[in-house]
Amino acid sequence: MQMTAEEKEISMDTPAKTATRDIYIPSERKSVSGGGKPHVVAKDFSIFYGDFEAVKKVNADILSKYVTAIIGPSGCGKSTFLRAINRMNDLIPSCHTTGTLRFDGEDIYGKLTDEVLLRKKIGMVFQKPNPFPKSIFDNIAYGPRLHGMNDKKQLAEVVEKSLRKAALWDEVSDRLERNALGLSGGQQQRLCVARTLAVEPEILLLDEPTSALDPKATAKIEDLIQELRGSYTIMIVTHNMQQASRVSDYTMFFYEGTLVEHAGTSQLFTNPRDRMTEDYITGRFS
């Protein structure tokens, strides 16, 4: 079975922007309380679009409460892998998987898995901000209401708590009833993070969350990731080598659907085990 043009487009990552290849190595990071246990475990996990194998037999442990960056050239399968973790790829008719992918020991693709509950526990923020055409308040309250929360006082508390976690409360607290589409791009992206946090996920998936933002807004998102680190397991797809080195504890490097290397970020950027990893992070190919 061959992929349609639309499915091929969906399976490929957004083309990388031209960027410097100077690598910034972060200083030693503080320890994470309660972290270190595998939160997501992939074993011989593959993803297909028809007959096309987009992700090939990945074996990896994603550790709880740490930040894991996923890097690699366009079309390498990094976003496809990320989307598989909360089953966003189910929306593509020809997509199917082999092997296993587990979350807290449970098979993500098991027959008894509740996809709605799974996506509550594993939230996702996309490349482009996608606020609903509703008020700021209703954007954040949408998820809790969907899951049965109707008490006005409780909803107000959740909205404030989520906006504070997303470092947005001080900027919007006096205009919660205004349309969220009136926010700046960076504010909209933080709103999307707050909307995800409102349903209290365990894992936060970020698919190139700053690629459409200016440097100032990008810095705020990176600061936010550091604030959330230790409270959530975070996975971020990025084309930006410096961003990966700044925000992550661990890095996964994909090439043509294969997980080439998965290591601590400092180790991967300073002493990669695989020659292909070294060639990529030093800009010999992109």
Curated annotation (Swiss-Prot):
<dbReference type="GO" id="GO:0015415">
    <property type="term" value="F:ATPase-coupled phosphate ion transmembrane transporter activity"/>
</dbReference>
<feature type="binding site">
    <location>
        <begin position="72"/>
        <end position="79"/>
    </location>
    <ligand>
        <name>ATP</name>
    </ligand>
</feature>
<protein>
    <recommendedName>
        <fullName>Phosphate import ATP-binding protein PstB</fullName>
        <ecNumber>7.3.2.1</ecNumber>
    </recommendedName>
</protein>
<keyword id="KW-0592">Phosphate transport</keyword>
<dbReference type="GO" id="GO:0035435">
    <property type="term" value="P:phosphate ion transmembrane transport"/>
</dbReference>
<keyword id="KW-0472">Membrane</keyword>
<keyword id="KW-1278">Translocase</keyword>
<dbReference type="Pfam" id="PF00005">
    <property type="entry name" value="ABC_tran"/>
</dbReference>
<dbReference type="InterPro" id="IPR005670">
    <property type="entry name" value="PstB-like"/>
</dbReference>
<dbReference type="GO" id="GO:0005524">
    <property type="term" value="F:ATP binding"/>
</dbReference>
<dbReference type="GO" id="GO:0016887">
    <property type="term" value="F:ATP hydrolysis activity"/>
</dbReference>
<keyword id="KW-0997">Cell inner membrane</keyword>
<keyword id="KW-1003">Cell membrane</keyword>
<comment type="similarity">
    <text>Belongs to the ABC transporter superfamily. Phosphate importer (TC 3.A.1.7) family.</text>
</comment>
<keyword id="KW-0067">ATP-binding</keyword>
<dbReference type="InterPro" id="IPR003593">
    <property type="entry name" value="AAA+_ATPase"/>
</dbReference>
<feature type="domain" description="ABC transporter">
    <location>
        <begin position="40"/>
        <end position="281"/>
    </location>
</feature>
<dbReference type="InterPro" id="IPR017871">
    <property type="entry name" value="ABC_transporter-like_CS"/>
</dbReference>
<comment type="function">
    <text>Part of the ABC transporter complex PstSACB involved in phosphate import. Responsible for energy coupling to the transport system.</text>
</comment>
<dbReference type="InterPro" id="IPR003439">
    <property type="entry name" value="ABC_transporter-like_ATP-bd"/>
</dbReference>
<comment type="subunit">
    <text>The complex is composed of two ATP-binding proteins (PstB), two transmembrane proteins (PstC and PstA) and a solute-binding protein (PstS).</text>
</comment>
<keyword id="KW-0547">Nucleotide-binding</keyword>
<keyword id="KW-0813">Transport</keyword>
<dbReference type="GO" id="GO:0005886">
    <property type="term" value="C:plasma membrane"/>
</dbReference>
<dbReference type="InterPro" id="IPR027417">
    <property type="entry name" value="P-loop_NTPase"/>
</dbReference>
